[in-house]
Amino acid sequence: MKENIHPTTFKAKMTCACGYEAEALSTKGEVVNVEICSQCHPFYTGKQRFVDTAGRIDRFRKKYAKFGEGK
């Protein structure tokens, strides 16, 4: 077996943008900043955000309606 082929692991302090902090093993370093975690992700919190897709579709059709008229 080869020696010294595994990356160095650190006891990392992970900090989320929402302020949640946790400790885990990581090869990235001792401090890891993340944008989203299980405390603030909509899937885990149940706070879903609905996007107004109808308005976006109407804008798309209005914008590209002139290209369909040339036929």
Curated annotation (Swiss-Prot):
Q: Which residues bind Zn(2+)?
A: 16, 18, 37, 40
**GO CC entries:** ribonucleoprotein complex; ribosome
Q: Name one GO molecular function term.
A: metal ion binding
**UniProt KW keywords:** Metal-binding, Ribonucleoprotein, Ribosomal protein, RNA-binding, rRNA-binding, Zinc
Q: Name one Pfam family in it.
A: Ribosomal_L31
What is written in the cofactor note of this entry?
Binds 1 zinc ion per subunit.
Transmembrane annotation, as ranges:
none
Family to which this protein belongs = Belongs to the bacterial ribosomal protein bL31 family. Type A subfamily.
Q: What does this protein do?
A: Binds the 23S rRNA.
Please state what the protein is called.
Large ribosomal subunit protein bL31
